[in-house]
Every structure is written in structure tokens, then in C-alpha cells.
């Protein structure tokens, strides 16, 4: 049987890669007055996003052919907005992207 990647919408939760998680943890939200510990942040993220490996997400992005939207941030946004918005990502076509022209 052939291995097929599920569509983003077939996941029960949105997905995020370990690299995207690290970027979120390393960046403090500008409007946050409460400094949460990394463990607490990870618990919150685990309730709303499923952590998947980078190659799985990259393969899914290649199959959807939405490369013109920018640089993938390693996160989907089917149900939950981009957590990586703190590092400049935004939701386009159910995937969080960073504008390739921004530094």
C-alpha cells in the first residue's frame, strides 16, 4: 500500500514543528505582562497543536504547492491562529508563512 500524507484538515488539531516551537519559546509576546515558564507554554501548545517532524510538514507543503505564499513557518492554521505570529508569520491557505522579503 502506498503511504499517503493526510491533508491538514484531517488532523484533529493544527500542527507545529519543533523548530517553530523553539522560535515561539525564544520570542516573548510583546503584549504579555505575565512571564510564563516554558513548561507552561508547552502544555498550552500541546493542547491546541500537534508536534510533527519537519520532513512530514515539508512533504505536505510540497504536495499542496503553495510555495508562492512565502517561507513556511512550520505550523498549520486550520483551526487555531499562528502561534508563530510572534516571529512574523501569518496564516495563508491554512499554513503559517513568513514574507520572504522580510528579514
UniProtKB/Swiss-Prot annotation:
This is a cyclic peptide. It comes from the Eukaryota. Disulfide bonds join 73-89, 77-91, 82-96. Belongs to the cyclotide family. Bracelet subfamily. Residues 1-9 form the signal peptide. The keyword Signal applies. The keyword Signal applies. InterPro entries: Cyclotide (IPR005535), Cyclotide_bracelet_CS (IPR012323), Cyclotide_sf (IPR036146). The presence of a 'disulfide through disulfide knot' structurally defines this protein as a knottin. Keywords: Disulfide bond, Knottin, Plant defense, Signal. Residues 10-69, 100-103 form a propeptide. GO terms for biological process: defense response. Probably participates in a plant defense mechanism. PROSITE patterns: CYCLOTIDE (PS51052), CYCLOTIDE_BRACELET (PS60008). Pfam families: Cyclotide (PF03784). There is a cross-link at residues 70-99 (Cyclopeptide (Gly-Asn)). This is Cyclotide vibi-I.
Amino acid at each position: 500500500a502506498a503511504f499517503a500524507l493526510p491533508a491538514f484538515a484531517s488532523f484533529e488539531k493544527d500542527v507545529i514543528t519543533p523548530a517553530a516551537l523553539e522560535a515561539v519559546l525564544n520570542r516573548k509576546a510583546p503584549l504579555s505582562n505575565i512571564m510564563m515558564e516554558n513548561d507552561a507554554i508547552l502544555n498550552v501548545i500541546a493542547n491546541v497543536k500537534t508536534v510533527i517532524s519537519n520532513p512530514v510538514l515539508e512533504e505536505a507543503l510540497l504536495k499542496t504547492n503553495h510555495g508562492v505564499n512565502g517561507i513556511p513557518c512550520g505550523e498549520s492554521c486550520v483551526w487555531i491562529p499562528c502561534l508563530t505570529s510572534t516571529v512574523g508569520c501569518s496564516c495563508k491557505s491554512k499554513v503559517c508563512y513568513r514574507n520572504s522579503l522580510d528579514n
